Amino acid sequence: MADKWWGEQLLGRGDDGDLWAVSAAPVTRGELRAGVAGLRLRFRESGISEGSSVLLRMTPSFTYLQVLLALWSCGAQVVLVDFRLKPAEFEPLVERVRPQYLVVAAGAGGPVTGFRQESDFEVRRLAGGRPAEDGVVLVQFSSGSTGRPKVIGRPAGSVLAELDRHAGLPGTPGPGERVLLLNSVMHNMGLMTGVLHALAAGATLVVPPTFRPAEVLRLMARTEVSVMYGTPVHYDLLARTADRPERLSLRLAVSGGERVPEETRQRFLAAFGLPICQVYGVTEIGLIAGDLSGRCIPPEIGPPVPGVELEIDGEELLVRMDRSPYLYGEHTDRYRDGWLRTFDRVGRDPETGVLSILGRSDSLVVVGGLKVDLTEVEAALLDHPRVAEVVVTHQDAIEAFVGGDEDLTADELTAWCRERLSAVKIPKRFFVTRQLPRNSMGKLARDRALMHRHITSERSAQSRPAELKGAS
């Protein structure tokens, strides 16, 4: 690279012959650097330079990662958009950020069958696009689990500071280790915790070309994976797979994004002899807390990582930031006087400093003049042996959307809740389905209207009643 850029040390680490990543085939660090250099030249010829704004929407692949690094090396601000979004979801995002360029896969849209070694793309220049926001190199959208996604911008210093926090977390992957990544490379945990930390640490990234559990396990054995990152859904599927290799080199399994259900945690522990360790962060700043020792049990998430400054106001977690992460002057209520409101309620052990997630500050509702924590209702229902996942909402009444055994009845769920919750906390309506909808990050969707649309759609497909009336 002729010109210096903020991530040059990441890309420059290691010898050309060192293994960078493995999927269907291996890729060396020399091949990575050569690929980025060639793409950078192509982007320069297209007019992309310092201060350009580029929206990136491609098939998950090693090409995608090389494109991202090449755009950054040009000095561009990159807006990441999930390939799986439908046009009705994607087009409003383009209107909101108004990029100067699109880098998109040919025929973008539709299902993704897995991770590819290579993928084709095209570069389009858009009229009337606005240049990069001052200092911002990475733009992401919040998960949108509770409504309209937020537009979040991170400067280079924020990205590098998060990588430093990962490096300071005891037990984190180090040089020469093989790191399996099941999280999406389009989102923060997959990109930062997986791709960029492995690049910075000198570890080798392993990304399965298919997410069929038995094939993932064989890849883990063949490549001698010692660390894996995934979501609770991934861990549950792997733990249920009977066809497991006799010998695995796995020493660490890490999850983030949402709480690991106790049943999944126990099943994985029994199958692999390892606990699932938790890390916690938010898109606005990245990694905040974590424990890779396996000693913390949900709802514990571990102590704050070195380099992050926290306060707990009442029970709400606040994080110190130099600037608002929200672009275009939005969400002024979420950042004030140097502190970001996470809207997560936490407790802190006075002796160990370990944080525990208590719920969301916006999950507290008033029913009959009494405060009800909807996460407490969810926790009670999740203890039911035939319930796999739950979202509890409140508008005119408390409603529970339950994923699990479709033979569950309202009477059974109501009786279960009555043994564990006071009457005011018991849902008035239950909606039971085999599986609840999730957003593109794999998190449970928490939008009530979306849940009702899902139930209605499923009812139409199956011609069976969807609503089960519960406690009166």
Curated annotation (Swiss-Prot):
GO CC, alphabetical: cytoplasm
Superkingdom field: Bacteria
Pfam families: AMP-binding, AMP-binding_C
MF-aspect GO terms: ATP binding; medium-chain fatty acid-CoA ligase activity; transferase activity
Nucleotide-binding listed as a keyword: yes
PROSITE patterns the UniProt entry points to: AMP_BINDING
Recorded coiled-coil stretches: none
Cell compartments where the protein resides: Cytoplasm
Keywords for the protein's UniProt record, in alphabetical order: Antibiotic biosynthesis, ATP-binding, Cytoplasm, Nucleotide-binding, Transferase
Main location class: cytoplasm
Pathway entry: Antibiotic biosynthesis
Reactions catalysed, as given in the entry: 3-hydroxy-4-methylanthranilate + ATP + H(+) = 3-hydroxy-4-methylanthranilyl-5'-AMP + diphosphate
Entry's Gene Ontology BP terms: antibiotic biosynthetic process; fatty acid metabolic process
EC number(s) from the headed UniProt entry: 2.7.7.97
Stated family: Belongs to the ATP-dependent AMP-binding enzyme family.
Functional note: Involved in the biosynthesis of actinomycin. Activates 4-methyl-3-hydroxyanthranilic acid (4-MHA), the precursor of the chromophoric moiety of the actinomycin, as adenylate. Can also use other benzene carboxylic acids, such as 4-methyl-3-hydroxybenzoic acid (4-MHB) or 3-hydroxyanthranilic acid (3-HA), but not pyridine, quinoline, or quinoxaline carboxylic acids.
Identification of the protein by name: 3-hydroxy-4-methylanthranilate adenylyltransferase
Lineage: Bacteria, Bacillati, Actinomycetota, Actinomycetes, Kitasatosporales
Gene designation per UniProt: acmA
